Amino acid sequence: MKTGTWRVKTGFARMLKGGVVMDVTNVEQAQIAEDAGAVAVMVLEKVPADIRAAGGVARMCDPAKIEEIMDHVTIPVMAKCRIGHVAEAQVLEAIGVDMIDESEVLTPADEEHHINKWEFEVPFVCGARNLGEALRRIAEGAAMIRTKGEAGTGNVAEAVRHMRIIRREISELTRLDKEELYGKAKEYGVPFDLVAEVASLGRLPVVNFAAGGIATPADAALMMQLGADGIFVGSGIFKSDRPQEMAEAIVEATAYYDDPEVVAEVSKNLGDEVAMRGLEISEIPEEERMQLRGE
């Protein structure tokens, strides 16, 4: 089968369905993630909570660090590039990452344009707050969508809101006639065929993971119950006091999200003193909210 085709890209993304992708910053963390059952790791210089705290410009991770992690784990390795930064994406593809996240967690390089992801053989994942954003990213070639949430906060509320918005807007599409779907395609700025496909399927044509503020096993179970195909965990694991236990618990809760007894068991001894502290969304100034980057 030819590499880099839409079928291959989306097929790879579907292989991760039901799993947890964990943010890591070094080999030790990557090995913890792999041992805990993560389906992939996302390599960055700092986890989102530290990016938020440090301020300044957040860029692609050092390629040497990514390659080092690739040499030490057997699961897929992803990495983030800045929104619109084609050269960073080219570097990541050149070193052989398995997927690129064109991410609002990093400082956008282009305030008006995202990367044309069709020009790459490596699959991309992108964030979305609503159906319009999701469809625009898919039209650009994204093989996976994730909620934006509000990364680095340990607060799942925005991820919940974004997942509910996307589900509601998809449900509304399924009730529209052809002329109304043409109107929606124009409103969203995407091809009619893509809107019609979503209306017919009753879901996105790619997998839709939850991300942004997931900090506990119960958070992961909640997002799966809301229809997520899988989970991205950023700061929630390695900002906790017991990373290994938290990683294993979130993997278990994601797999058995519909079994409260399992979620309860893996959540034991992972209370506020263990989970990351978290931020209240309303206390974050609008200009510091990562989710507002890249509409």
Swiss-Prot record:
Its EC number is 4.3.3.6. SUPFAM superfamilies: Ribulose-phoshate binding barrel (SSF51366). The keyword Lyase applies. Pathway: Cofactor biosynthesis; pyridoxal 5'-phosphate biosynthesis. Belongs to the PdxS/SNZ family. In the presence of PdxT, forms a dodecamer of heterodimers. This is Pyridoxal 5'-phosphate synthase subunit PdxS. It comes from Methanopyrus kandleri (strain AV19 / DSM 6324 / JCM 9639 / NBRC 100938).
